[in-house]
Amino acid sequence: MKMLVEKIEKKFDQEKVIEEFEDLTKDAGKIQEETLKKILEQNGGTEYLQLWGLNGRTDPQTFKNCVPIVTHNDLEPYIQRIADGDLSPILTGKPIETISLSSGTTQGKPKFVPFNDELMESTMQIFKTSFAFRNREFPIGNGKALQFIYSSKQFKTKGGLAAGTATTNVYRNAQFKKTMKAMCTPCCSPDEVIFGPDFHQSLYCHLLCGLIFHDEVQVVSSTFAHSIVHAFRTFEQVWEALVVDIREGVLSSRVTVPSIRLAMSKLLKPDPELADTIYNKCSRLSNWYGLIPDLFPNTRYIYGIMTGSMEPYLKKLRHYAGELPLLSADYGSSEGWVGVNVNPKLPPELVTYAVLPNIGYFEFIPLGGNLNGIEQANSPVGLTEVKLGEEYEVVFTNFAGLYRYRLGDVVKVKGFHNGTPELQFVCRSNLLLSINIDKNTEKDLQLAVEAAAKRLVDEKLEVVDFTSHVNVSADPGHYVIFWELSGEATDEMLQDCCNCLDRSFIDAGYVSSRKVNAIGALELRIVKRGTFHKILDHFVGLGGAVSQFKTPRCVGPKNSSLLQILSSNVVETYVSTAFC
């Protein structure tokens, strides 16, 4: 581990990193076998693997014959014992010392996931590989990154293990900062801002640091596109206060955390000239179009995860970015990494991820038309056996104690990089709007919202954010869509949007069910401005990190606190007449 850090710190050799990646992917099948063997040799003596009778064998066939495919629920009791302080080799040979929390935005509560040195090492490998391909197409010099990153506090589990979100565990690791420095993208903001206890204050200071180092900013990034859009929506509200801070060299009283105030006082000096420049730029912008390149003229690109539930934010992000390219970050989850973006010139909507064959052992459940993948759960195919154009659910085995673990993601094979597949993220397999025979995915919801939102364009209105819910307490059950708008719209327009939403779900099961009233009329509920910000605040209040926040696109019945926030902020309700 120490050697890895020293190697990164010494010099970042872009061509060598690319060469190593090419070698790994040329013989992906062999690398996969070696990776599985390594995982099983390290962990073969664990309670979990002993249970399935591997008896020291490390070949893929025996592994697949003996060890079952599982979901998080199956492993949860084992992980809980680790978190509670059981030091016996339960899932891994070496004790787990850190626990990651999943975002919790999908299911309503965070999951515990083991985190160890090997996962950190694969994170750095992903970062380095991605940067090498990115830097080849969009080279940057010595500068800084305006990174809207926020680290929630780590806490101790009942058994004394450090626990925090996956992003927190990465940001707090010494390797992270060294790697960023080696890749010429150190963060503009001091640690006190990144690790601040109040994300509103941290965000304000991230923006201020970006302005202080405006000429040095080469990359604007965050874990997710949502955080970048949220940051610049906030900038629209606070820019004049930021200008005053820069003009006077004194930090606004809105920042109250002593450690942040002290750190910022070392950076902030009176600069009337810069204050005038920023004021003039902001005053002449048309509806904030091209805000990012105007404020940070040496920025090469915007970087963050932009697929899946982040796609709805791309329109606003492009508005802020002007002509700057949007580069989608890599494919992973709290449980571990899957693939790296080696084609950074592709727009986010078309981005693919080449699977790294040495960071885990990968299997793929063929889906056909069955999004739940249950029927095929016993017949997954290997990394090199996937077929072009087919959709699969990802199953992986990693170095941190997850064995044949269903990630819950649906991917499509779009091509191959040497011997490894290039995957396109399709949707979360469990994010379905479904009442009976209808099946609508997150992508279907997104397309329906996009179609309906076009009716708002002429009025210069936009959908700020959205989510959905299946109301089965009514008979017949029906879909409920929640919208937050940027301004006021007429009843006539919103009724039209509601009907358009209903018609835009083109799944055959939905349409046929609507026609015979087996599914009731869709409801569009408009919520107050700031409602989705309240959802973000609620998530952070539960210990989540802003960097990991994803607006849940479907709120299930168990997520009662989110439903309560949404329901208590509804200002108008419209019922579809599309199938009357």
Curated annotation (Swiss-Prot):
Keyword Nucleotide-binding: yes
Record: residues binding ATP: 100, 120, 123, 164, 169, 332-337
Origin superkingdom: Eukaryota
A Gene Ontology BP annotation from the UniProt entry: defense response
UniProt: jasmonate binding residues: 103, 329-332
Similarity-based family: Belongs to the IAA-amido conjugating enzyme family.
Annotated source species: Nicotiana attenuata (Coyote tobacco)
A Pfam family annotated for this UniProt entry: GH3_C
GO cellular component entries: cytoplasm
Name recorded for this polypeptide: Jasmonoyl--L-amino acid synthetase JAR6
